[in-house]
Every structure is written in structure tokens, then in C-alpha cells.
């Protein structure tokens, strides 16, 4: 039984709640002292993990819609991508304002040099920014075939973001490994498309 348009609308409502509720919980935890002795790191990791969850959910939509024969599921992909960018922006903002401090933002360039994992994170954010700006139907019509080539760069984010997470933790724990493995599974699930994109991307880089 295929999902109806009305059910998709309700699904989008639930996805909006899934994007908003973690933020409300985080605000509550900060105000109630529900974080650890290093709340800045807690906030950074929480926002980053939530962004990763939405990234993985975005990557899951296309193969799930195809194999479950639910074409209307595709309509949730943009929403998930927007929430991914929103949480990635919160993640970047928490680092810039809470760790560096508003008076030390000029140090960001130096930080990118001394901490390469930050470079991977910044690259991922800029890609998500570009994908968000061009996520509308108007942008899709204007860009034509280039739109799909641009939005295939989400695959690069799916590679860089888990590496960024793995590299950033001082003590390796199962959680970043699980995210990395899930990203690999989702890329392998669309092996042909990913292989074509990778060959094109690698060819231009070399």
C-alpha cells in the first residue's frame, strides 16, 4: 500500500518535530545543568551528531523510496536536508562562539591549519550551504543538468563528516564508528550512482 499525499504531509510534520525537539531538549539541558562538566563539548557533539543523523536520513530516502516502492517519500528528502544544514550550522556556531569566542573568531584560520579535522567540517558545511541555497524547484530548473551534479556532492559530505567526527574525538568510542559504518552502508546501497560520481569527482581532482 502506497503512502498518500496526506500521509506525506503528516510525515513531514513528524520530521519537523524530530528536528525541533532535540533543540528544545538541548536548551532545557543547558538551563537545568543537565550536561557534563564540559558543557561546550557536549553541545558541540550533540549538534554535530544530530546533523549527522539528518544527513544519514537524507541519504536513506532515495533507496528506501525505490525498494519500498513509495515514490512520494522523495518529497521528504529536501526537508531532511534542510534540517541537516540547520544542525550543521548550530554545530559550527557552537564551536565559533562557545569555544573560540566572539572576540577570537580571527583565530579560525589558524585553527583550520592546526586541526585538519576542522577543515573537513568546514568543507562539509560549505557544501551543505550550497545544496541548501539550490534546493528549490526554481534553482533546479535554472541549473538543469548541473543541479544533479551539484547535489551529488552530498556523497562527499557523507565521507568527510564521519571522518571529521572520528578525528575530533580524543578517545575513540563506538558512536563515531557506527556513524561512519552507516554512511558507508548508505553509499554502498547506491553503489552505481556513487561510483559514477566518484570517478567524475576524482578525475577532476587529479
Swiss-Prot record:
GO molecular function, one term: oxidoreductase activity, acting on diphenols and related substances as donors
Pfam families recorded: Ferric_reduct (PF01794)
Record keyword Zinc-finger present: no
Alphabetical list of InterPro entries matching this protein: Fe3_Rdtase_TM_dom, MsrQ-like
The keyword Oxidoreductase is annotated on this UniProt entry: no
Compartments reported by the entry: Cell inner membrane
NCBIfam families for this protein: PRK05419.1-2, PRK05419.1-4
Functional summary from the UniProt entry: Part of the MsrPQ system that repairs oxidized periplasmic proteins containing methionine sulfoxide residues (Met-O), using respiratory chain electrons. Thus protects these proteins from oxidative-stress damage caused by reactive species of oxygen and chlorine generated by the host defense mechanisms. MsrPQ is essential for the maintenance of envelope integrity under bleach stress, rescuing a wide series of structurally unrelated periplasmic proteins from methionine oxidation.
Protein name as annotated: Protein-methionine-sulfoxide reductase heme-binding subunit MsrQ
Taxonomic placement: Bacteria, Pseudomonadati, Pseudomonadota, Gammaproteobacteria, Enterobacterales
Amino acid at each position: 500500500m502506497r503512502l498518500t499525499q496526506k500521509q506525506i504531509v503528516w510525515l513531514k510534520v513528524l520530521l519537523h518535530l524530530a528536528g525541533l525537539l532535540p533543540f528544545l531538549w538541548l536548551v532545557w539541558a543547558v538551563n537545568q545543568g543537565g550536561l557534563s562538566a564540559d558543557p561546550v563539548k557536549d553541545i558541540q557533539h550533540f549538534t554535530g551528531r544530530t546533523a549527522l543523523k539528518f544527513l544519514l536520513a537524507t541519504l536513506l530516502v532515495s533507496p528506501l523510496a525505490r525498494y519500498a516502492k513509495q515514490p512520494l517519500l522523495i518529497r521528504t528528502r529536501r526537508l531532511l536536508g534542510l534540517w541537516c544544514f540547520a544542525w550543521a550550522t548550530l554545530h559550527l556556531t557552537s564551536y565559533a562562539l562557545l569555544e573560540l569566542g566572539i572576540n577570537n573568531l580571527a583565530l579560525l584560520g589558524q585553527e583550520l591549519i592546526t586541526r585538519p579535522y576542522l577543515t573537513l567540517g568546514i568543507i562539509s558545511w560549505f557544501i551543505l550551504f550550497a545544496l541548501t541555497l539550490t534546493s528549490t524547484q526554481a534553482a533546479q530548473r535554472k541549473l538543469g543538468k548541473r543541479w544533479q551534479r551539484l547535489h551529488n556532492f552530498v556523497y562527499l559530505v557523507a565521507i568527510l563528516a564521519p571522518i571529521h567526527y572520528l578525528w575530533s574525538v580524543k578517545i575513540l568510542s563506538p558512536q563515531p564508528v557506527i556513524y561512519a559504518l552507516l554512511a558507508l552502508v548508505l553509499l554502498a546501497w547506491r553503489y552505481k550512482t556513487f561510483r559514477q560520481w566518484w570517478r567524475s569527482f576524482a578525475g577532476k581532482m587529479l
